């Protein structure tokens, strides 16, 4: 589709300047479009906790390089033509070593791609985002860091545990229980952590939980201090185990908790008894499969998650164009000749008006036809086009729609039913 400069300015006043600048950058780069890599924090698991900027970038990505995320729904936000590359990392199981991931990002950037590196949590909180940024900087590839909500704060919050509380503490320490396998000596200062005041939060440490708790106690940590482990935090399959620094490892083992999980140590864990809001939601702990098309599943999935459910999107239907396109196109062109237009689904409305506006520019060209809809979802879609529904059945099925039309006391005349 061709747009002149005036049309571009009307659509977006800043777009024309952006395109001019982009063209200039390509010229300065020897005719090759300059790529960019976005190091994007996907948040702790719930896709609703990604930042607005983050979701915007996923929707613009040409290449999506992603880890083993808690929610795969984010991948569906990318354009259909977007290349998706899995480089999943969890504990010692890596689809690609970090050095190869760095090289991949550099290669894609040099190829002029708009790359989104989607990382769980925050890219700069034990996410090795700093190493990837270093590699891009050394290669001269432009990059942008988009912070994410870290599970160090969100995980405890969803378990009813604030990491700070004026009644208990005014500081907290975050550390990792997982270090590089090739390191000759640990750089983790467990003595300093044991002596630190306030809340202590450990990420990626479930395999070493017993060793860490034992070491902390050995360095002076009070064994009776409350502690909690939160697995799959912020999702509908979240599980929380509480105890003390001394008892937590055994309780975690008995409950079968594993990675990914966040461990919290401190008196703030006492607040869970009164502040545990998420695990009390009506659908918490329920796994629900949404079989709608990917384009339509998002709103329903989001509503279910807000009620605490774990949602799996598994489309079993696909909206296809009419098999007889010529016949359908002719019926749309002659829409103004009908007395009634009857719509049986929101998809029917969408397809009808895609074809309609390919021919007509004004909604008034639809003529004086009266409008019937099968249900409130279809009615809502028609309202988006400025059309009011005059007939809607009490039962939102095809039989109910036919009966409603029959019950209309005026002569129906010719009916166009948009089912395809």
Where are these regions (language model features)?
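Signature of uroporphyrinogen-III synthase
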Residues: 45, 97-101, 235-420
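Short, conserved loop/helix-junction motifs that constitute active-site signature segments
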Residues: 59, 77-79, 193, 217-224, ...
């Amino acid at each position: 589709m061709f747009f002149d400069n005036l049309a571009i300015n009307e659509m977006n006043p800043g777009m024309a300047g952006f395109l001019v600048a982009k063209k200039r950058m390509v010229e300065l780069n020897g005719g090759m479009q300059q790529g960019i890599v976005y190091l994007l924090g996907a948040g702790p698991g719930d896709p609703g906790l990604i930042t607005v900027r983050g979701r915007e970038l996923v929707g613009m990505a040409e290449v999506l390089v992603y880890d083993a995320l808690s929610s795969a729904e984010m991948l569906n936000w990318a354009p259909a033509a977007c290349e998706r590359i899995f480089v999943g990392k969890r504990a010692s199981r890596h689809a690609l070593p970090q050095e190869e991931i760095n090289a991949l990002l550099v290669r894609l950037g040099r190829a002029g791609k708009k790359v989104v590196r989607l990382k769980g949590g925050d890219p700069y909180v034990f996410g090795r985002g700093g190493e990837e940024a270093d590699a891009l900087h050394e290669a001269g590839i432009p990059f942008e860091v988009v912070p994410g909500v870290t599970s160090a704060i969100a995980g405890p919050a969803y378990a009813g545990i604030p990491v700070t509380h004026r009644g208990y503490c005014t500081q907290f320490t975050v550390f990792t229980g997982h270090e590089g396998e090739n390191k000759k000596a640990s750089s983790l200062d467990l003595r300093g952590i044991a002596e630190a005041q306030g809340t202590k939060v450990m990420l990626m440490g479930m395999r070493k939980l017993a060793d860490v708790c034992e070491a902390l106690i050995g360095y002076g940590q009070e064994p009776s201090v409350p502690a909690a482990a939160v697995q799959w935090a912020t999702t509908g399959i979240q599980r929380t185990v509480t105890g003390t620094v001394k008892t937590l490892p055994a309780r975690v083992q008995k409950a079968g908790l594993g990675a990914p999980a966040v461990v919290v140590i401190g008196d703030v864990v006492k607040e869970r008894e009164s502040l545990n809001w998420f695990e009390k939601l009506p659908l918490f702990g329920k796994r629900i499969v949404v079989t709608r098309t990917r384009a339509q599943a998002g709103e329903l999935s989001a509503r279910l998650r807000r009620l605490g459910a774990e949602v799996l999107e598994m489309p079993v239907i696909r909206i296809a164009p009419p098999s007889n396109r010529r016949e359908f196109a002719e019926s749309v062109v002659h829409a103004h000749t009908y007395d009634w237009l009857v719509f049986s689904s929101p998809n029917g409305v969408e397809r009808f008006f895609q074809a309609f506006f390919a021919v007509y520019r004004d909604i008034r060209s639809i003529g004086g036809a009266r409008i019937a809809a099968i249900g409130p979802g279809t009615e809502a879609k028609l309202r988006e086009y400025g059309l009011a529904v005059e007939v809607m059945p009490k039962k939102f099925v095809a039989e109910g729609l036919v009966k409603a039309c029959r019950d209309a006391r005026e002569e129906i005349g010719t009916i166009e039913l948009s089912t395809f």
